[in-house]
């Protein structure tokens, strides 16, 4: 992998997927539009270290976070959000930061990403394995395609320090 790499975090199960989808469909107004793109929404679970009470409705995410803090290099969480891309939609070509040669600090964990991919300019398409975590070089122009009839759901975690991003 060149612009995207899997990192050794515990696998996150799909036990909360239906709850996440229900929360999204019933609580749509609680989700923020990301970068002015109508098909891409997010909900902050942890923001500036403050945890939303909604986290208690997602026990597999809670267990995963506890395991990560206990058994991995991920410690303090600065930001954690659910990211949802509508079925048969895309996040157009964009960059998230200026530096193109380093991995971003944020960790993307796939919850439901079947029949979707991230593609980087002058590179290939990367397909996330559900339950696994990845780092991307978000300074490289990229897009996300959801070819599925289902919501594409990921968890984006930004720790205060991410040693996985420093490893080549």
Which stretches of residues belong to each language-model region?
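A short beta-strand-loop-beta hairpin characteristic of the jelly-roll/cupin
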Residues: 110-129
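A short beta-loop-beta micro-motif enriched in histidine and acidic residues
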Residues: 76-77, 90-106
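Non-heme Fe(II)/2-oxoglutarate
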Residues: 1-74
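A short glycine-rich, His/Asp/Glu-containing loop-to-beta-strand
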Residues: 68-89
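Short, conserved beta-strand element in jelly-roll/cupin
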Residues: 84-86, 99-116
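A short hydrophobic beta-strand segment most commonly corresponding to one strand
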Residues: 104-111, 133-135, 149-167
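Asparagine-centered strand-capping/turn motif at beta-strand->loop junctions
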Residues: 144-148
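Conserved metal-binding segment of the jelly-roll/cupin
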Residues: 126-142
